Each structure stands twice: as structure tokens, then as C-alpha cells.
Amino acid sequence: MAFHYPDHGLAMDPSSAAASSPNPSFSPGGGGGGGVGGGEREKAAVAAHPLYERLLEAHVACLRVATPVDQLPRIDAQIAARPPPLAAASAAAAAGGPSGGEELDLFMTHYVLLLCSFKEQLQQHVRVHAMEAVMGCWELEQSLQSLTGASPGEGTGATMSDDEDNQVDSEANMFDGNDGSDGMGFGPLMLTEGERSLVERVRHELKNELKQGYKEKLVDIREEILRKRRAGKLPGDTASILKAWWQAHSKWPYPTEDDKARLVQETGLQLKQINNWFINQRKRNWHSNPASSGEKTKKKRNVTGDGGAEQSW
């Protein structure tokens, strides 16, 4: 008994799937089961096997990789139309389907692994070659723009945004009113429906991959910005109280310890926050009044000569 791996695709229903997968030489006990009877027993064995559902899922996953988006509902409809697994197994048992033995188990396992590997190869092929096609179209657009001076998307209002789902269609609208030609003798430039679906699908997958790759970093950056904003913002009207004191003592904006104690009571801030606010405020206003800066520095040195005054900023 020998199972072979056909080149064509696995069918959607159990009977045709079994007919296309194993070699007709399979029969109970390993003997020759040619003819219609042997084929029916073989179908029943595959349909009743525990790995049949997994094999069907792997096959459908391969079909989905390169199927245009607008054609995916047809696959879903075919899957929904097939009988439930329990009904299929009951029908196989009623037909006298054999278990298949170790050779059928090995075949089903290898076929599932083969389809999973094939799916990965298909995904890689679609991504690489589709991106090459997209880049080729982009280079053609750039060459056309350099020749004509007209932007391909000019007048369409197309923008890149997360909520835009029909960018490919908006780009195709450039050729509305034409017969598919570019109007300059360069031949047809419009993509077919399948090509547009493929480009849209690749673009959507790449955008999702980029989002997932940078999502955590973007969230961390946003949280850091918000944290700094919260840390640098004084609560309530405390800033107004400090600014009022600053305006009243603009000639000498250095509060004494008693002044700081009163400001702590009035604002509810900590002494460190009061000190930091005045340090930053003096830095912001250092160059606003250069004429009096020399006088302020001289007066400050006289006051802090005993070494017990505020630290210089």
C-alpha cells in the first residue's frame, strides 16, 4: 500500500478530498482494493480519520493566502455548505470505512505538515513579489511624473491615513473616463480587479505588521510625554499665586525662607516645587531685562556673601 502526494489541490468535501489524496491501492488490511469498491473504502477512511479536519484547515489556509479579498466569501460559503464533522464520520462509518492503519496515519500527518510548509512558502512569495510589483509601479509613476510634471494622485484628494480603506480604488479613479489607456500612447496602466485586491491586501498586512512592531514603543513614548506634562503642570491656581508674587517682587525675585513658607501654605506645594519654579522662572526671564541683570547679580552677591543664601542658578 502506498500513498502519493498529488500536485493538484485538495477538494473541499470529504469524498473528493479522499479521492484526490491517497493511492487507490489502499484497502483494509493492506491488500489490493482496486475498482469502485476500493476507492469508496479509501474515501471513507480519509473522511473518518481524526486528522482530516486539520488537513482541510491547512488546505483552506493555503487557498486564502493568494485569493483576492473579494473571492474569500466563496471559500467561506463552500466550507459552510459541507456537512458537519460528526455527520461526515457517521456517513463514513455507515459506508464501512476502515481505520486505515498506521500507513494512513503517517500519510495524513505528512500531508498536514506539507500543507503548512506550503502555506509559509506562499506567504513569503506573495509578500516579496507583491512588494516588488508595488515598487515597480511606484517607479513607473515617478518616471511618468518626471516626464509630464503631473502627480499621479493630483486632484484625487487621496491621503495616507489609518481609516482609509479604498486608496487603491482612489488611485484607479485617475483613469475614469478613459478606456484604460494613459492617453499618451504608453498603453494600459490600470490594474485588474485581482491585482488591485492583491495590492490592497499586501498593503494592509504590511501596515498591520508595522503597527504591531512599533505599537509598544509608541505607547511608551506617549506615556512618557503625558507623564512629563503632568509632572510639569502645577495644580489649580498655584501658578497664578506664584506669578503674582513674582510680579510684586520683579526687581528682586528671590523669596526668603519666610516667603517660601507662606507660599507653601497658600499653594499647597512642597518647598522643592517652590524652589524649582522660581529657578525656572528666573531662567526664563533672565534675558528679558538685560539692563538690570548686572544690578541684580551685584545685589545677589552682597546678600549671599555669608554663604547662607539660595544656591545660584
UniProtKB/Swiss-Prot annotation:
Superkingdom: Eukaryota
Cellular-component GO terms for this entry: nucleus
Compositionally biased intervals (Gly residues): 28-38
PROSITE patterns: ELK, HOMEOBOX_1, HOMEOBOX_2
Domain ELK, residue spans: 205-225
Record GO biological process: regulation of DNA-templated transcription
Record region (Disordered): 13-40, 282-313
Biased composition, class Low complexity, residue ranges: 14-27
Expression across tissues: Isoform 1 is expressed in roots, leaf blades, leaf sheaths and flowers. Isoform 2 is expressed in leaf blades, leaf sheaths and flowers.
Subcellular location(s) per record: Nucleus
One term of GO molecular function: DNA binding
SUPFAM superfamilies in alphabetical order: Homeodomain-like
DNA-binding region: 226-289
Entry keyword set: DNA-binding, Homeobox, Nucleus
UniProt-listed PANTHER family: HOMEOBOX PROTEIN TRANSCRIPTION FACTORS (PTHR11850)
Family statement drawn from the similarity comment of this UniProt entry: Belongs to the TALE/KNOX homeobox family.
The protein, known as: Homeobox protein knotted-1-like 2
Source organism of the structure: Oryza sativa subsp. japonica
